[in-house]
Amino acid sequence: NTDYTFTLNREKITELADGTDRDISNGWFVGHSIKTHYGLEKIGIWQLDEAAEAAKYGEKPGRIKIKDQNKDGSIDNDNDRIILGSETPDFVMGLNNTFKYKNFDLRVFMYWRQGQMLHSEANGYGSYRIQGDPGIKVNYWTPENPTNEFPRPEKSYSDSSKLDALGYVDGSYLKIKEITLGYQLPKSWIGKIHASNIRIYCSLKNFFTFSHLDDYDPERGGSLSYPMTKQAVFGINVDF
């Protein structure tokens, strides 16, 4: 037996009270979702063979590479920030599957949010990460590891607007919220204790998440908080 829900949400701001088309401080833009992300666009990390080009922007290999939107040869908040995406997903889907075979029963509940952008505080407030905190696992750029994921660690680097650009990530995820396996004991086994039904079960909650984010639960919406608690429950239902 399968039950599912499917939700499409389309929202946009049609006008602002002051008659303008944008309110940057609140992140409101006419024609876009209420939960819109606006900032500099990270397009990678400057690599060794791009040293000359990086120098034109006052950068060097291993630092964050920002797209020069207006192609004026410099990066600044006034001219190079754009609408990057929205926290409103393209769709949300829930799927509840129940299977039964003889005395066994299995329930699997899955939840899927697709097409949302999150601002990960763990990345966006990256100064403590880029400064090489030894307690944090990060795929840093080095000459031997020319990744485009995270810049080189530097103790003195503090360009907040570029660090903030690290935080905008694809927040789509598929989560198996619950798996429950049960077994109903045969009547011949339980007759002596005068029970009409005994079912034993095991349930796992929030154990499996599939997303583009490492070591972070996207269900938390980007905030620096504990992930959803994983639970393993063993139980027994007895009817007399």
Regions inferred by a protein language model and the residue ranges of each:
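Outer-envelope beta-barrel architecture signal
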Residues: 2, 91, 102-104, 172, ...
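Membrane-embedded beta-strand positions of outer-membrane beta-barrel proteins
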Residues: 2-4, 108, 200-202, 236
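Transmembrane beta-strands of outer-membrane beta-barrel pores
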Residues: 6-12, 101-103, 112-116, 178, ...
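Extracytoplasmic gating/loop element in the C-terminal half of outer-membrane beta-barrel translocons
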Residues: 113-200, 204
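C-terminal beta-signal and terminal closure region of outer-membrane beta-barrel proteins
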Residues: 24-43, 150, 161-163, 207-240
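Conserved small-residue
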Residues: 1-87
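Extracytoplasmic loops and strand-loop junctions of Gram-negative outer membrane beta-barrel proteins
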Residues: 74-83, 88, 134-137, 159-167, ...
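Membrane-embedded beta-strand positions in outer-membrane beta-barrel channels/transporters
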Residues: 1, 92-96, 178-182, 233-235
